[in-house]
Curated annotation (Swiss-Prot):
The gene is dlc-2. This is Probable dynein light chain 2, cytoplasmic. Belongs to the dynein light chain family. Acts as one of several non-catalytic accessory components of a dynein complex. Transmembrane segments: none annotated.
Length: 90
């Protein structure tokens, strides 16, 4: 099965971290079909890889306004699902 196209809509992450996050999102969507399960998997993996505290929002349509640590934000679309990921808090 070919990988779905990832569309990065907005990010301020460095390339290596961005690439790791995209890899984790792809793995989550391969393993799970429910948005909340995708979000939980991504959050747990990023907390392990990069330290706490990551927040993940998944869905086809949502609005948002968040505060985050500079260099730790990405909004992407994968498999027709929008995924917002950011780090905030300790």
């Amino acid at each position: 099965m070919s990988e779905e196209k990832i569309e990065v809509k907005e990010t301020d992450m460095e390339d290596p971290q961005r690439d790791m996050v995209i890899s984790v999102v792809r793995e989550a969507q391969r393993l799970y079909n429910i948005d909340k399960d995708v979000a939980a998997f991504v959050k747990e993996e990023l907390d392990k890889k990069f330290g706490a505290t990551w927040h993940v929002i998944c869905g086809k349509c949502f609005g948002s306004r968040v505060s985050y640590e500079m260099g730790h934000f990405i909004l992407l679309k994968c498999n027709k699902v929008n995924v917002m990921i950011y780090k905030c808090g300790y």
